[in-house]
Amino acid sequence: MKKLRSSTIGLDQGDEVLFQDFEDGGEMWTGRGQRERRRRIKFSDRFLEAPTVQLSISLWDIDAGSVVRADVTSESVTTSGFDMVFRTWGDTKVARVRIAWTAIGALSDDDSWDVV
């Protein structure tokens, strides 16, 4: 369990189209084997420490003739942002993916101060 040491909690969120490979015959739509797409997401304000980030697929357009294989994760989470990562493998053909994200964590509080 992550314990927050601040009385001010921040929640930031967004919804990002990660790719649309059907439009230009991109690798996720035409390729085979292990494939990955990632995007750096920046928070609207800095957190006091790295927040907890939750991702969910809000849209996917996948070929019905192949097995659906997908891995969605956040990596390199810092106080200012994170990497949104989508992976697939095998014969899965992915036309497009949109991922919703939520980050929650402690923010600095103007009423808090450190005694040195």
Regions found by a protein language model. Give the residues of each.
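Extracellular receptor-binding modules and their adjoining Ser/Thr/Gly/Asp/Asn-rich linkers
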Residues: 1-49, 60-63, 77-116
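Glycan-recognition/cleft segments
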Residues: 66-77
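Short, hydrophobic/aromatic beta-strand segments
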Residues: 50-55
